[in-house]
Regions:
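Flexible, charged surface loops at secondary-structure boundaries
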Residues: 1-3, 55-60, 89-90
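PRPP-dependent phosphoribosyltransferase catalytic core
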Residues: 3-28, 32, 79-193
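Short, glycine/charge-rich flexible loops or terminal/linker lids adjacent to PRPP-binding catalytic cores
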Residues: 18-63, 72-79
Length: 193
């Protein structure tokens, strides 16, 4: 008998105090419009915000939905899932819910054995939309643009880990091609637009 669904914002265990967009999504999951969906109508949606609270309530959790606004490579989600498992919650109880996901991130999460649900699935902006030879030219062009705007870290030339995302939200993910978000460095830290 399932009377409660637990939701948890995807977060990094090392930076848990950092405000993440998953917190905002969790807030909406508790609202009236969401409760009108038949799957949630007779369920209590319980928000858990910290890893220590997850551990404290692990025996009550039958379904845990990890939420975020965007999944890029899947690295953050997999790290969060691993931390959740360390707190005693098995992955067969875990699902990921996101607004937008890169296909590569979706595959990474599913490859680990955790279902992921997204409103929008995005392919790589260049590699998945052009023939190989044309894509290679466009990738080199994007790398030149990244150098011109002084993106110092080569692993960001095509977005984090070459995600080639074309996604912007309140805070543009670094998976997005850098000319959308890169503002250079200040005091040794990457500045985001």
């Amino acid at each position: 008998d399932l009377d409660a669904i637990h939701v948890f914002p995807i977060q990094d265990k090392d930076y848990f105090s950092k405000t993440k967009s998953g917190n905002i999504i969790c807030y909406f999951l508790q609202g009236t419009p969401f409760r009108k969906l038949s799957v949630f109508r007779d369920k209590r949606v319980r928000l858990i915000e910290t890893f220590s609270a997850l551990e404290k309530h692990k025996d009550e959790i039958k379904i845990l939905i990890l939420v975020d606004d965007f999944v890029g490579t899947g690295d953050t989600e997999l790290a969060c899932i691993n931390t959740v498992e360390e707190k005693g919650i098995t992955k067969n109880k875990i699902s990921v819910l996101t607004l937008v996901s890169q296909e590569c991130g979706k595959k990474a999460v599913e490859g680990y054995g955790v279902p992921i649900y997204a409103s929008v699935i995005k392919n790589k902006a260049i590699s998945d939309n052009y023939e190989r030879e044309e894509a290679e030219k466009k990738i080199e062009q994007m790398k030149r643009i990244s150098k011109q705007i002084r993106v110092k870290e080569q692993n960001l030339y095509l977005g984090y880990k070459e995600s080639e995302a074309l996604v912007t939200m309140n805070k543009t993910p670094n998976n997005t091609l850098p000319f959308y978000w890169y503002e250079g460095k200040k005091d040794g830290k990457i500045m985001l637009a």
